[in-house]
Amino acid sequence: MSSAPPTNELALTPPPPDRPELPDGVEPTPVVPRWKPVGVVLAFALGLAVTLAGTLLIGGIAVALGADAKSLPSGVNVLLTLVQDLAFVGAALFIASTVARPEPWQFGLRGTRIGPFVGWLLVAFFAFNVFGWIYGALVNVPAQKELPDELGADTGAAALVAAAFLVTVVAPLAEEFFFRGYVFGALRSWKGMWVGAVLTGLLFGAIHLGSTPDVLYIPLLAVFGFVLCLLYVKTRSLYPCIVLHSVNNSVAFAGTRDGWDWEIAVLLAGSLGTIALIALLMRRFGGPGPTILATA
């Protein structure tokens, strides 16, 4: 059986033409980097490793200065929690940088129209609260007071403000950046929106195992993480997710404080105002990002 001799036709074939030029004033549609699922594993591992190293370092210094290793001061706990949040944000940025230079818009830090922002945020808020009401009616979920008190919320005004800032501002920003901005982005490009949202929700619930007073909270947190993924998809912006996360944490934080009334409104206004200021600063120094995101 004979075959035709090989030719160099392929080698002589000219390369495909460049993409056609766009009209003046028209920007090309940016493409979100296709982060890999292995990056999620690496980001988790790196975040946990940095958190552990920071805990050993800061905790060791505190113990060397006379603190009780079994009951660290609230200020140390605040610092350790901050280190953990920053560790996971840094891990996401580092792993993402191995694929492409990280830009804020790639993680969803971009504006969106006010209509979808408010509309879908309200839908997500009511959907999660309906689920929470049904879940609470079926399962006896214990009250949660441990975390704010561990952060020193009951030891004075300054400690209360620090704990509130950490829970209602830092945590929503860091967790949404890591889970919705990076983890969901990677898993969505791997297995699609629904599988990505489910997996991200499960991971979001699992990461809170050490900070919740009862395992019965984990399904609630997993569903909350899932809802936040869908909110991100509908608005194509991380900011509605951050706002909803902050509102949820603010209400939960206020629920741990006995006798709070008008303080709840102050907490909500303060946390959302701070987040809005941070968003404006990011937009100013990081750029507004593209108008339309390509679907990953």
Residues covered by each model-derived region:
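Juxtamembrane helix-loop-helix connectors linking adjacent transmembrane helices
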Residues: 61-78, 101-171, 189, 287-294
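Alpha-helical transmembrane segments in multi-pass membrane proteins
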Residues: 44-99, 267-269
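C-terminal membrane module of polytopic membrane proteins
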Residues: 3, 9, 243-296
